[in-house]
Structure formats: structure tokens, C-alpha cells
Amino acid sequence: NYIYYFLVAKYMADNMHCKTGVDNIMNLCENIHDDQKANILIFIAHHIKNPQFVEATQLALMSALDNQKPVSLSKDDDYYKLLNEICESLKQEIIKPTEQIDPEKEREKILKRRDENERLVSNEKVNPNSLPIEIQNMNKSLRSIEVVGQIVKNRQGSLPKPDIKTMVMEMYGAAFRTIGYFGAIIESEREHVVEDVINNKNEGASNNEIIKKIDSFFELTSLNFCLFVFSKVINAVGSKELRSTFSQIAEEIGTPAAKLVSFSIISCFSKIAIPELEDLVEDLRDNPVAMSIIRARVRSYLYNNHVNFSDRQKIINTVNLNPRDSHIVANKPSRKSR
């Protein structure tokens, strides 16, 4: 598949100087919800520096779910209300106090799970145009994020910094609209699901118990989808060279969601600056949803990076993972890193 995508992308990039070539690129952008077309666009991004290509992919990104209100994860946000209860219950997630952690092994586990998931997805042959329109709309947005992210990564040294910043901000916007779109679907379907389950229930469980379990399912699904979309942005555009850009965007957008994405990117691709973490926690301390995501991100950071004992203690205390973590040991260095 990769050889096919590479050759098709090279051919299309070499022929973009003519009208037919431009039309072909535009067709790919209009049908970016199709995985095959999106993959070709990602490969084209390796070959081409044509401004028309950059503009076409940006347009696809900006137009994706453009009528949808983006999530903010502020307390008055509808999506926040979907997540609040389950995030309250996750407050006590901890890192085991005496656990020896090998970051290399932890990263290997993550990569293995990712490969398994990709293999399962690649084995499923589905006509993208036969999927429900809601799925197509979300796929268009998510695939646009991947393509524009590839352009940013490839051309961060040649494109003007304001252009890079604009493109990344559009990626944030598309991600937040996608999450909002999913939340609207969840809200619209919840009552139908509750009604169907109650009407077809077996004796035993009360209606209140059923509603509670369904609500928990929707809350967990909503949280997982939010983190999934955040991870799309992180993987698409993550780069330690753009650290200052991510910080600027978080400040300009100003929402908890933007601050969480920027913090997540920075912690994935460079070292956590403890003063910055302290400022973020101080800003979002009263937001259980944001704090739950910060703790999850910090936990991942500590499991996947070598962090000395002193910094580890400061980070744990800053996010208040658990009082018992005052005795946590530093990461165990692997033989390879000695």
C-alpha cells in the first residue's frame, strides 16, 4: 500500500502544474474522508511545495464541520457536562509508590498496541461513501488534521512562522469542532437508547440502574473520543521545534481545551517545564475534567521518560496524583541507556 501511495502521490505532485493535476488534487481534498485519498494527500505533502496544494488542504480543514460549535471544556461547555462525573471518579488515579518503571518497555507496549490496532483497521474493507454521513463528516475533519499536520512538519523551516501558526490553529479548531459534533450526536441519541433498553429489558435491573449504566457508558465513550481526537492533533503536528507556537496558540484561544492540547503536545515531544505545569494547574485547578486529562498526561509522561527523583516528586506533587506518591522511585534506566 505504501509503495502505491508513494507512486501515485509522486505522479500527482509532478503534474500539478496543469489544470488536470490541480483538479485531481481538489478531488482528493473534497473526498478526504476516504482513507485511500487521505493517504495519497499525506504522501503528496512529502513531494510538493505548491501554494495551491497548501491552500486546498487548508480549505478542507477549515470547511470540516464549519457550522459546529467547538468545545472549550470550560464549565459552561455542553461537552464538559458529559465528562464531569466520570472525571470526578478518576481523581484518585495514581502511580504505584514503589513501582520501578522502564520507559523503553512502556513505549514498546504502546507501539505494539498501536500496530495491532492499525492491523485490525487495515483488514476491514469498507466503502467510505457507504458509512453514515456523521462518520464521513468526522473522518473528513480528522483526515484533514493529519494532512495539514504533515505539511506543517515538512515545511516548518520554509513556511513563514505566521502561516505555520495559522495552520496549527486551524487544526485545533477542526479538532474541537469534531469533538463538539460527536457530543451533539451523543446527546441526541441518549434518550432513544435509554428508551429502547428499558422497553426490552429483562426483569431484575431497575430503570434507574439502567439509566445510570447507560450514562456511564456515554460518559466514558465521550472521554475516550475527546482523548482520541486530542491524540490525533498531537501525533499530526507534534514537534519540539514548535513549542513556543503551541504555547502562543493556547494563550490566544484561551480555552481549557486549547491549553490541554498544547500541554499534551509539549509533554509528548519535549521535557515538561515544572513552572509551566504549575501555572497550568493553578489556572485549571477547579476544572475536574481538565485536571483529569492533565493527570493522565503526566502519568504517561512519567511512565515513558527518564525523570530524576527530584523532578518526579515535584511533578507528582504539582498535579496531586496521590499523597502516597511522595515515596515514588525514579524511573529505572534500561541497560541500553547506561
Residue ranges and their predicted role:
Residues 2-6, 10-204, 229, 233:
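Hydrophobic repeat-domain scaffold segments
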Residues 166-174, 180-338:
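Charge-dense, extended regions
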